[in-house]
Amino acid sequence: QTLRALFQYKPQNIDELMINAGDLIYVNPAQQSDASEGWVIGTSHRTKSEKEPNVKLNGEAHNLSMSRSATNALSLQNAALRRAVLVMRHGERVDQVFGRSWLQQCLTADGKYYRADLNFPSSLPRQKDGMKQFECDPPLSCCGIFQSRLIGEALLDQEVTVSYVYSSPALRCVQTAQHVLQGLKLNPKVRIRVEPGLFEWTKWEASRAIPNFMTTAELLEASYNIDTSYRAHFPLSSLVPTESYEDYVSRSSAVIKQITSACPSKAPLPPFFAFPGVPGVILIVAHSSSLASLTRPLAGLPSRDSRDFAQMVRKIPSLGMCFCEEQKEENKWQMVNPPVKTLTHGANTAFDWRNTILGD
């Protein structure tokens, strides 16, 4: 097994090796699990041989023994190389801030879009059916775009390797995925797979109809990094309005199973990754309901009661995350802490200087 050192380690004893950040170390996984007091035997990549049991140190052959701190650093990298799923809610929507009538606030008399507040996006992508479709498929606010990019930058800081990205067809989810990838500096290297099966529980759609989502062609025209070769597991036509809770749970369980099956543990990753052929994180950008409906079946947990589910979903903020790691030895997935911290901020209400300062 190949591990990468996250930190430098200077030898304290003659049988220890100088390790620099980024060095590759070859270790036997069985020896890792049997390590005593944090010590593990491995082979430095400088030997140019994965099978050589000893390493050259100051002209002499020695077994490589690392202190607990160095071992912990390598074990962190080892954990990062496990196949994992990061389920994320989209960023802040414009209608969350400005209400359902947000579009009426920023359309001129002749139907042209203008930015009525700095938290409105500077422009809207073009749709063949016109602006009206955005009422049922709202975009991110400018703060939502910032939130998404900030999360991507945080994932980059933690050296999280994202190898696949899936998104609900909702525009806010596609936009979130796009800006997370920009923060990760993976755009356009990793493309977004739009999966209609990831859409939220359709019972919650106020219009009592499935929104007319932007087509792949429209998303590409708007410069979204879409994987055109991807074939969805659930076509848009399979989404029905006012589906039952049981049907939604069944759909979510099926789609997460299909996604993880389509992303093998030894994926042929592009050459820009530090470890070609090793597993990475499957990023899924969807809705607040997705955090439970996707991760619970993956972790082998039963679905929640529909009333408890509805109450729980209301507590999930923009960019809320759940993280599952595959435990190969036990052939199961386990929910663990996400690789980055939560994003918390306060409200910033509209300000009218005339009414506030002059009292008019």
Regions found by a protein language model. Give the residues of each.
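Short glycine/proline- and acidic residue-enriched helix-loop micro-motifs
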Residues: 130-139, 223-247
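Active-site-proximal alpha-helix that buttresses catalytic centers in soluble enzyme cores
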Residues: 9, 68, 76-189, 249-252
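Eukaryote-biased feature marking scaffold/signaling PDZ-domain proteins and nuclear chromatin regulators
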Residues: 1-4, 12-23, 34-37, 80-82, ...
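Structural signal for hydrophobic/aromatic residues that build the beta-strand cores
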Residues: 5, 19-27, 40-42, 85-90, ...
